């Protein structure tokens, strides 16, 4: 098993398929990346040289926003929504559905998780009283 830009890939996978497992790279970007580097369509991960793997990582780092950068951006967007008290920010805080889904009979999993979270907090609050 090898890692390319933080994503695990099996040695028998094609480069195109393995690169789509990286957050931020879809099928079209994977094909573009392969063409820009001059890598064949059917080449597998274990057939790549160290130099080719380094080239792939450099190209991804230069041109694409991937994994930790995406996660950081998403978290910053959510924090911004919460800080300006937008409806979506409040729903994020509550753990409720954001996009108008029904909550009376649905979203049971989210409600269970909220309930479990409150149960964990109760004994701590009672201990401080």
UniProtKB/Swiss-Prot annotation:
It comes from the Eukaryota. Part of the small ribosomal subunit. The keyword Cell division does not apply. Its main location: mitochondrion. HAMAP family: Ribosomal_uS13 (MF_01315). Residues 116-129 have a biased composition (Basic and acidic residues). It is found in: Mitochondrion. GO terms for biological process: translation. InterPro entries: Rbsml_uS13_C, Ribosomal_uS13, Ribosomal_uS13-like_H2TH, Ribosomal_uS13_CS. GO terms for cellular component: mitochondrion; ribonucleoprotein complex; ribosome. Located at the top of the head of the small subunit, it contacts several helices of the 18S rRNA. This is Small ribosomal subunit protein uS13m. It comes from Zea mays. One of its GO terms (molecular function) is rRNA binding. The keyword Mitochondrion applies. Keywords: Mitochondrion, Ribonucleoprotein, Ribosomal protein, RNA-binding, rRNA-binding. It holds the Pfam family Ribosomal_S13. Belongs to the universal ribosomal protein uS13 family. Residues 92-129 are annotated as: Disordered.
């Amino acid at each position: 098993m090898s890692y390319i830009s933080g994503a695990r890939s099996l040695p028998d996978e094609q480069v195109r398929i393995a690169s789509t497992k990286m957050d931020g790279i879809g099928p079209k970007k994977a094909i573009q990346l392969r063409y820009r580097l001059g890598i064949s369509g059917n080449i597998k991960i274990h057939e790549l040289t160290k130099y080719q793997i380094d080239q792939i990582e450099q190209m991804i780092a230069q041109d694409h926003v991937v994994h930790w950068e995406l996660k950081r951006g998403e978290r910053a967007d959510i924090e911004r929504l919460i800080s300006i008290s937008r409806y979506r920010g409040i729903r994020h805080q509550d753990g409720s559905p954001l996009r108008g889904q029904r909550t009376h009979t649905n979203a049971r999993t989210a409600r269970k998780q909220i309930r479990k979270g409150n149960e964990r907090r109760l004994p701590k609050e009672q201990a401080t009283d």
